[in-house]
Design a protein with these regions (language model features):
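Core catalytic lobe of class I
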Residues: 1-326
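Conserved phosphoryl-transfer catalytic core
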Residues: 45, 331-332
Length: 332
């Protein structure tokens, strides 16, 4: 479908590409998930990526959501879980096809929930031998730019402009700075946190950890105190630290996806839905109102759906007939 599109007809690409052969999204031979390994997957992407470069306007961005893959020791023969650096492979793949690499946004994930899915970060195993333990696997948004026509100037052929009355100098200086200054406010104590439910507890702890000077020992002490009182959940991380860096997003709401509506309506849930938060931020930052935002792996049409709500036009391609039909219902 990308091959059918006109040259330079897309203003922004936002997509979550298949994670190699980690998932099989549809029972179709054409599914990108039906590949032997990473090398085979990227060989298939070699057919799509040049088309994405062709249809994108000069100077505009392709925002690629990816996640590293966990490799299990009993499969690889390593004996311990290791990590396949899928995001790094993605960087070099898109560079090889002519995109300029603009950087990477890190989206923090919950290590407790991750362990419940992969069993590679278990507390008991950590206590037996810490050397076999890595860290949680965040998600990444890789930012690639199609070179602008005039390489002597940095501007896109059609810039994404901001109105200075709404987007002030002060706001930009804060946005552009890598870290936020501390107000000196202290963290809440475990006793103060006990009165909140798990959801509100997590939000308050994250907000306060952004504004106060971080204290690792105090963070651990709060968690231990909550655990002694039976207040520390074992299925998700209730007191995750907040991020000061603009390129590390700690507040993505995992429940805000079209899968929530799918489940409520008794329809098939997507195996890997994009949260609204990620999509909205990318659309607002990298496109103008009225422009066309495209997702070549549209799934439930999250990207075109959010684009329309944000005053843009949306387009997407999807192999699964069921996902496609459900996506049309959201767009209707």
């Amino acid at each position: 479908e990308a091959k059918r599109k006109e040259d330079e007809s897309i203003d922004l690409i936002v997509t979550s590409i298949p994670f190699s052969n980690h998932y099989e999204y549809t029972p179709s031979y054409n599914d990108f998930g039906h590949t032997d390994n990473n090398r085979h997957f990227w060989a298939q992407m070699d057919f799509l990526t040049p088309e994405l470069l062709r249809i994108l306007r000069p100077g505009r961005l392709a925002c690629i959501h990816v996640k590293d893959r966990i490799l299990f020791g009993n499969v690889t023969g390593a004996g311990v879980p290791t990590v396949s650096p899928f995001h790094a492979e993605g960087i070099f793949h898109y560079l090889s096809h002519g995109f300029d690499y603009m950087g990477m946004v890190t989206v923090v994930t919950d290590v407790v929930r991750e362990n419940n899915q992969t069993y590679r970060l278990g507390w008991s195993e950590q206590c037996k031998d810490g050397t076999k333990m890595g860290v949680g696997s965040p998600e990444y948004v890789l930012l690639f730019r199609k070179p602008q026509t005039d390489r002597t100037r940095g501007y896109a052929d059609v810039p994404v402009e901001k109105d200075k009355t709404n987007y002030t100098r002060a706001r930009w200086q804060i946005d552009a700075h890598a870290f936020w200054r501390s107000s000196g406010d202290r963290l809440l104590s475990a006793k103060e946190l006990e009165g909140y439910g798990p959801d509100e507890m997590g939000q308050r702890f994250r907000d306060l950890s952004r504004s106060a000077i971080y204290n690792y020992a105090q963070h651990v002490a709060i968690g231990e105190s909550l655990e002694r009182k039976g207040k520390l959940p074992g299925t998700f991380m209730a007191i995750a630290p907040g991020s000061h860096a603009e390129d590390v997003w700690d507040d993505v709401v995992r429940m805000r996806t079209l899968n929530t509506d799918q489940v409520q309506k008794g329809r098939e849930a997507h195996v890997c839905p994009l949260p609204f938060d990620i999509v909205d931020r990318l659309i607002n930052r990298y496109s103008n109102k009225g422009e066309l935002v495209y997702d070549p792996f549209a799934g439930l049409m999250t990207v075109p759906y959010r684009a329309i709500l944000l005053g843009r036009r949306g387009g997407g391609s999807e192999l699964s007939e069921d996902y496609f039909k459900d996506g049309l219902r959201y767009l209707d």
